[in-house]
Every structure is written in structure tokens, then in C-alpha cells.
């Protein structure tokens, strides 16, 4: 009897069988992010690059606007190596600003406009910005946040700056600007005009140049600024060219994600522009209107989070609509239970879509995406296969000892989209970026999962979401969520840990449930049925201690389930 030798993902790379050899062998561009967009679209300058509430910008328009913005940045004293803090939603101006800063060797520090004065102040001070760019609607908070910093000038833009003329008038009537601006404020159009006569020469390509700093809790929970380079952005876009059966020049992508997360800029702006798409900009999504926006614009592509697609599947406005235009609607940023995945896939199939929900997995530290399940290369429950130039493997948690395919461990990522590091946090950078004996730099994600024999990645849970019982048994929330979400009355569910009342240490799994709006099932009946399902399908130590019904899941500002809030909301009376 022979013993089969273990197979290791980092060596076997079984996922490569799904890719064309020309993409496996491709070299990554040695260009700035802006130059890559220009290079890819040099023969398509009259194609539409951006659509902002019906106002269209061609690629030629975009390039002109970027160069004008670059000149304007130089006009206010920005130079190579400077970091400009931007507090805004996605608008054409913010997109031009990204590429303009890139062109002159500067960096954007992207901050969520919903942050408090203290939060904005902290992020300005951390990178020592001398220039602040903000939306007019958050100017007062930004003015206060800029106190006791080195900010010298503030550029203020309005969501109306690029609206079609009639809409711009309507916006200004319904949302008048009542700010009292300080003397150091420059309005956007005045800012652009101030760049006249300044140089529009691009800085030479620098492989070490940081395009943006985006902020994340990362794997330890403390706020950190993730530095992403031109190479990170370009490598992400270049790898997506391997999905050429789905992605074709001239298609539309609706960008519903904000600019202050890597997902919003890397997948929502740079990727589609490199592929020659039209980017439909939705600066401030109302989730209830997502279905109407999909019907209005008919985008073939969209990147969102699982909650967006559950919203679409439950939207009565889409009940009898033809959605055959959908090619790649991708869910990332949060876990998608098997029940929710099946619900969304049934919805897509019933409305004429050719492919199931596309899934991806990644993190800010790898420029948002590391795996893709696109088209028919898709297994239920998985988050797809590694991108063509990316390697993923499972390791014994916290070590460099790789585990064989099929064994659960800490998922680690190695590839060209890996961040440069955390801004001014060398110790924390060293914790997550580690050179292994194979010579590669690996990102230690803090996520538990495994790869199957075909190279599909299956995600169990973040290590920090893992529930450890009093007896040391480990419970992954996804184990329970995958069972509970299949109940026909359940719209959404999330599992968190609660205190074990019978032991001095350890936690127990607690299930939150949102019922479907049209369900007629009684709550007590649903609980009895869920208890039976869990008893039949899960080990004894994984059984939930209690179930609680809520009207909706609390969400973080970027659309992920707020697990910390769910944990805080558990009362001793609930179980």
C-alpha cells in the first residue's frame, strides 16, 4: 500500500489550469497608473470613460482633466513626495485628482467623510498634509479638523461641479452651500484656473511611488494607513485581463463603492478604465435605489458587498425584469453564506443572467482582491481561485509552515498587488508581511480556510471572529451561517460569540436572524426548525446557544456586517 505524497498549493498551483498560458506568462507593466490608463486607451480616446448622472466624459476629456488638475496641484505648491488628504465621496474631480497626484509623484491620503472631527484630524496629522481637499458638505468638520495641523490650503469641491447644467442648478437650489469659508479656501474651479501656465510634465515612473494611503483596521484592529503603489494598481488591473471571456472594451461598470477603500479605487475605477469600460459613478448609494439604478444604466459589471446582492434579490421592482445584460456582479469585502449565495444565484438565473454571482476575496493590504470566481469557473461556497499572478496557500497559523491542499490553516497571499507597508508602522508591517524560506513575501491574512484540489479557496472565518469555547473547541461562524441561511424563511443571518454563563472562560455561538419580508412562518416555528437543522448537520460543540430576530443587520460605513455591534447588543436575557 502506497501513501500519497501531500500536495502544496504554492508549488502545484492547480488553479492555473483555468487560465490561458499567455496570461500566466504575462509581464506586468512598468508604468505609472495614469500612464497605464493612457496607454491602454490611446486608440480609443472618443470612447466614454465616465458617466456622472448622465454627463459623459470621454477618455480624451479624462486625460485633459487629469493634466489640468496636475497643473493646479503644482500651482498650489504640491510636489513629488507630498501627501494630499482627500475627504470626499467618488466624483469625477476625485478621479482626476487621483491620476493627477500620481502624474506628479504625489500621494492621496483618502479619508471617509463620515469620520468625526477627531478622526479626520488624526489622519491629516499622521501624514503631515499641507493641502486638504474636501466636499463642501463636510467643510466645517474639515475646517475644525485642520486646526493644529500643517494644512495651509483647503480645496473645496461640490458634488454639483460636474453635474449636467440643469441638475447642477437643481442641486444648488435644494442643497444651498451655507458655509462661511476661511481665507485659505480655494473652490475647485478657481483651483483649476490657478494651474494655468504650470507644467504638465509627468514625473518619471518610480516603482516605489505610493499612489494612495487608505485606512484599515487590518488584522489587529488598530487603524493603519495602507500604502499602495502604482504597481499594485496596475497588477490588479492586468490580472483581470485574464477574464477576457467576460470583460470587453466598451462595457459598463457601475461603481457603488467609495474612494476611501482600496476596493472602490482599485476595482471600481482603475481596473475598468484600464479595460476600456465606462465607469458609472454613484457617489452616495442609497441601497433601496440599487435595483432602480441597475435597471436605468444596465451595467454588465458591478463590484459590491454581499448585502448589495441580497438587496437586489429581494427588490420587488426587479420581479419581472430582464437582467440578461448582467455578466459579472461580484461580491467581496464580507462573507457570503451558502444560503445567501443560492438565493442570489436563483434570482439571477430566473431573470436571465448567464452567470452566477461572482465572488472574490482579498484585503486592503493586497489592493482589495486576490481571488476571483468569475463566469462558470465558480464553486458554491468558495471565494474563487487565486488571480493568475497570485499565490495563495494555507499555513499553520502565525508560522511559515505550509499545510497540504485540503488542510485548514491561515490563508497567506503572495503576489504583485501586495502593499508597500503600513504608513509609519514598521513593526506592524513586519507582523503581516513576512519573508518565508521560499524567498517570497507572504501576507498573513488572519483568515482561516483551505484550498481544494482544483485550487478553489474556501474561507472559514477571520481568526478574530473565531469563537473559542471553554473546552478549547473552536467554532467558525460560517459553519453555522451556512446551515441557518438555507432555511426558506431566513433572509440574512450572522453568528457572533457570547459569554458562557456556566464557565469562567470561553464563548458560545449566538445567531442573529433577519426574516424574509414575505415570510408567514412564526418565529418559534423557525427556531424549532433551525434547531433541528443544526442538530442534524453540525457537531454537538457547534450548536448555537440562542437565536435572536432583528429587523435588519447593523452595517459598517462600507457595507459590511458590524459584528462588534451585534456582540454588544446581546443581553443576558437573550439566552
State the predicted function of each range:
Residues 52-57, 69-115, 127, 136, ...:
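Conserved AMP-binding/adenylate-forming
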Residues 115, 132-134, 302, 415, ...:
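AMP-binding/adenylate-forming catalytic core of the ANL superfamily
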Residues 63-68, 193-196, 207, 226-246, ...:
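Conserved structural elements of the adenylate-forming
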Residues 178-215, 222, 245-252:
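Conserved pre-ATP/AMP-binding loop-to-beta segment of ANL
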Residues 300-304, 313-380, 391:
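Gly/Ser/Thr-rich phosphate-binding loop
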Residues 157, 536-561:
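AMP-binding/adenylate-forming catalytic domain of the ANL superfamily
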Residues 234-252, 260-303, 307, 311, ...:
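Conserved AMP-binding/adenylation subdomain of ANL enzymes
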Residues 58-60, 211-235:
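Conserved AMP-binding A3 loop
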Amino acid at each position: 500500500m502506497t501513501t500519497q505524497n501531500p500536495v502544496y498549493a504554492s508549488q502545484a498551483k492547480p488553479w492555473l489550469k483555468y487560465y490561458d498560458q499567455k496570461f500566466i506568462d504575462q509581464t506586468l507593466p512598468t508604468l505609472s497608473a495614469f500612464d497605464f490608463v493612457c496607454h491602454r486607451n490611446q486608440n480609443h480616446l472618443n470612447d466614454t470613460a465616465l458617466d456622472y448622472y448622465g454627463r459623459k466624459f470621454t477618455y480624451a476629456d479624462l486625460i485633459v482633466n487629469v493634466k489640468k488638475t496636475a497643473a493646479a496641484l503644482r500651482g498650489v505648491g504640491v510636489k513629488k513626495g507630498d501627501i494630499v488628504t482627500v475627504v470626499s465621496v467618488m466624483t469625477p474631480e476625485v478621479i482626476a485628482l487621483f491620476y493627477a497626484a500620481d502624474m506628479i509623484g504625489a500621494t492621496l491620503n483618502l479619508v471617509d467623510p463620515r469620520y468625526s472631527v477627531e478622526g479626520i484630524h488624526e489622519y491629516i496629522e499622521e501624514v503631515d498634509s499641507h493641502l486638504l481637499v474636501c466636499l463642501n458638505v463636510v467643510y466645517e468638520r474639515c475646517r475644525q479638523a485642520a486646526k493644529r495641523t500643517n494644512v495651509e490650503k483647503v480645496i473645496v469641491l461640490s458634488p454639483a461641479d460636474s453635474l449636467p447644467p440643469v441638475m447642477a442648478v437643481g442641486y444648488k437650489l435644494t442643497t444651498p452651500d451655507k458655509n462661511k469659508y476661511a481665507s485659505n479656501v480655494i473652490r475647485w474651479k478657481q483651483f483649476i484656473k490657478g494651474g494655468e501656465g504650470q507644467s504638465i510634465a509627468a514625473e518619471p515612473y518610480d516603482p516605489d511611488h505610493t499612489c494612495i494611503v487608505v485606512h484599515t483596521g487590518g488584522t489587529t484592529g488598530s487603524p493603519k494607513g495602507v500604502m499602495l503603489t502604482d504597481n499594485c494598481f496596475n497588477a490588479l488591473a492586468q490580472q483581470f485581463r485574464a477574464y477576457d471571456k467576460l470583460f470587453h472594451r466598451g462595457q459598463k461598470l457601475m461603481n457603488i463603492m467609495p474612494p476611501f477603500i482600496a476596493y472602490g479605487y482599485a476595482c471600481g475605477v482603475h481596473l475598468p478604465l484600464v479595460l476600456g469600460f465606462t465607469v458609472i459613478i454613484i457617489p452616495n448609494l442609497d441601497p433601496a435605489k440599487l435595483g432602480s439604478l441597475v435597471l436605468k444604466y444596465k451595467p454588465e459589471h458591478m463590484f459590491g458587498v454581499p448585502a448589495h446582492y441580497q438587496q437586489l434579490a429581494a427588490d420587488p421592482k426587479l420581479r419581472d425584469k430582464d437582467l440578461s445584460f448582467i455578466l459579472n456582479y461580484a461580491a467581496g469585502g464580507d462573507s457570503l453564506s451558502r444560503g445567501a449565495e443560492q438565493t442570489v444565484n436563483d434570482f439571477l438565473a430566473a431573470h436571465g443572467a448567464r452567470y452566477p454571482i461572482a465572488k472574490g476575496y482579498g484585503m486592503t493590504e493586497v489592493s482589495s482582491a486576490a481571488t476571483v470566481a468569475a463566469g462558470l469557473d465558480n464553486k458554491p461556497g468558495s471565494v474563487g481561485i487565486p488571480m493568475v499572478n497570485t499565490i495563495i496557500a494555507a499555513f499553520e497559523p502565525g508560522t511559515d509552515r505550509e499545510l497540504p491542499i485540503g488542510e485548514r490553516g491561515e490563508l497567506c497571499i503572495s503576489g504583485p498587488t501586495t502593499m508597500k507597508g503600513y504608513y509609519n508602522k514598521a513593526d506592524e508591517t513586519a507582523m503581516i508581511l513576512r519573508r518565508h524560506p521560499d524567498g517570497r513575501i507572504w501576507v498573513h491574512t488572519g483568515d482561516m480556510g483551505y484550498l481544494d484540489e482544483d485550487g478553489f479557496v474556501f474561507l472559514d472565518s477571520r481568526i478574530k471572529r473565531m469563537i473559542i469555547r471553554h473546552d478549547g473547541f473552536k467554532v467558525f461562524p460560517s459553519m453555522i451561517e451556512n446551515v441557518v441561511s438555507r432555511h426558506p424563511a431566513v433572509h440574512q443571518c450572522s453568528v457572533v460569540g457570547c459569554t458562557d454563563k456556566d464557565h469562567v472562560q470561553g464563548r458560545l455561538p449566538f445567531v442573529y436572524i433577519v426574516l424574509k419580508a414575505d415570510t408567514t412562518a412564526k418565529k418559534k416555528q423557525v427556531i424549532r426548525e433551525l434547531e433541528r437543522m443544526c442538530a442534524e448537520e453540525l457537531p454537538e460543540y457547534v450548536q448555537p446557544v440562542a437565536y435572536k430576530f432583528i429587523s435588519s443587520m447593523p452595517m459598517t460605513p462600507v457595507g459590511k456586517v458590524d459584528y462588534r455591534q451585534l456582540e454588544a447588543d446581546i443581553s443576558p436575557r437573550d439566552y
